[in-house]
Amino acid sequence: MGKNVVVLGSQWGDEGKGKIVDLLTEKASAVARFQGGHNAGHTLVVDGKTTILHLIPSGILREGVTCFIGNGVVLAPDALLKEMKNLEDNNVPVRERLRISPNCPLIMPYHVALDQAREAKRGSGKIGTTGRGIGPAYEDKVARRAIKLADLFRDDLEEKLRNLIEYHNFQLTQYYKVEAIDFDETLKLCQEWKEAIRGMVTDVTEDLNQLRLAGKNLMFEGAQGTLLDIDHGTYPFVTSSSVTAGGVSTGTGIGPLYLDYVLGITKAYTTRVGSGPFPTELFDDVGAHLAKVGHEFGATTGRARRCGWFDAEALRRAVVLNSMSGICLTKLDVLDGLEELLIGVGYNLPETECAGAHDAEFYESVTPKYETLQGWSESTVGITNYDELPENAKKYIKRIEVLIGCPIDIISTGPDREETIVLRDPYDA
C-alpha cells in the first residue's frame, strides 16, 4: 500500500515547505492543498531556477504528479489563471494535471475590497493580512452564503451574486466609505472563470480516495504555519483556516486514520511576517544578520520578515497539536558563522495571565527562557551527508530533538532541492 504524508509549517509560516514538498514528490503520485488561498507563497529552486507558487500545489514541477486543490481552499480564479499562465509560459504543463474541488468557496472582488478596507480602518492595530480577501471569503463560507466553484455552473448564480453584492456593498459604502462593487462586471468575471476552469473541476475527495485504494503515495501540502492556525494560533493575529494536520481531513475528505506521517517544516531560527507577538524576536545585529543571510522577505507580500532565536517551546506545542512524526529543519546554513546560538526553552509567565490561552495576549505577556549553545564557523551550505556537518551543528540539532520530543528527519542546507540531508524519508518510515 502507498503512504499518505502531510507536510505543514510548524511556526509562523515561511518555513520552506515548497522546497520540501517538491523534493518529496519524487515518490508521490499526487499532491493536494487543503486550506488557505493565494496568501501562501511557496518558493522552489530547481537547478538554480526559482519558481514561486501561491495557489497551485508545489508538486506541479514534478512530471507526472497530479495536483489537487481541495474544498478547504478559498479559490481566487483570477490568481489561479495568472499562476497557470506563468507556469505554462515556462513549459510546465498545468491544465491536464490540475484538479479542483467544486466545493471551493470563491474569493470575489468584494472580499478583496472588504479585506483592504478593514485593514485601513484598523490603523495602528492592523492584523497584517495580505489584503487578498482570504478572511472575508472564509467568513462567507462559515455564514453559509459563499459562492462556491460549483455555483458558476448553476442557473441561480445571478440571483445569488446579486444578493451578495447588495449585502457587501452596504458595508463597503455605508461603513467603510469606499466604492461599491459593480454587479455586471463581477457577473462577467464569473462567466469568464467558468469557461477557463471548466475542464479542471472534479470530485477531489473521490479521486484522492481512489488513488489511495490503488496503493499510490499521496502528499498533503499545508500553507502558512501552526502558530497562525485560526484555533490554535496567536489569535487574532492568525489566518482564517485550519492550518494543522486536522485540516487535511476537513479540507480534502481524506479520513484522519488514512494519514500515515506528518512532517513539520521548521526553520533553524524563527521568523514572522507582519503584526503579532513574537517572544524570541531579535532587534540587534544578529537579527539583521539572519534577515540578510536568510533573504527574509515574504514570497507573497515582499514584506521583510522579523527574525529571532529558535523557539523550542512553541515548536513543542506544534508537535503535539499536529501529532508530528518528524521534523524537517530548514535554513541551517543561515546560522553558519555565529559564535553563540540561543534556544528559547520555555517562558516566564506573569501570574495575571490566563495559563493555556496561547493567544496573542498570552504570547505578548511572556518572556523567553534561553539556553546558550556554541555556534560553528564552518560552512554547512550544500552538505548532503549528516556526518559532514560541524560537531556543534550536530549538537544544536540533537538538543532541539530533545526539547521538542520529536526526531529531525530532514535537514535543509540550501535553497535547491538537492541541498538536503535526508535521515529518514517519510515514504519509507
Swiss-Prot record:
**EC number(s) recorded for this UniProt protein:** 6.3.4.4
Q: Which GO terms describe its biological process?
A: 'de novo' AMP biosynthetic process; IMP metabolic process
In this chain, substrate is annotated as bound at A299, T300, T301, G302, R303, A304, R305
Tree of life domain: Bacteria
* Residues at which IMP binds: D14, E15, G16, K17, N39, A40, G41, H42, T130, R144, Q224, T239, R303
Q: Where in the cell is it found?
A: Cytoplasm
* Pathway in which this enzyme or protein is active: Purine metabolism; AMP biosynthesis via de novo pathway; AMP from IMP: step 1/2
CDD domains (UniProt xref):
AdSS
Q: How is the cofactor bound?
A: Binds 1 Mg(2+) ion per subunit.
Where is it predominantly found? cytoplasm
Q: Name one GO cellular component term.
A: cytoplasm
One example GO MF annotation: GTP binding
Hey, what's the signal peptide range on this chain?
A: none
A Pfam family: Adenylsucc_synt
Which key words tag this protein in UniProt? Cytoplasm, GTP-binding, Ligase, Magnesium, Metal-binding, Nucleotide-binding, Purine biosynthesis
Q: Does the keyword Cell membrane apply?
A: no
Keyword Cytoplasm attached? yes
Which NCBIfam families does its entry note? PRK01117.1, purA
What family does the database annotate?
Belongs to the adenylosuccinate synthetase family.
What protein name does the entry list?
Answer: Adenylosuccinate synthetase
Q: Which gene encodes it?
A: purA
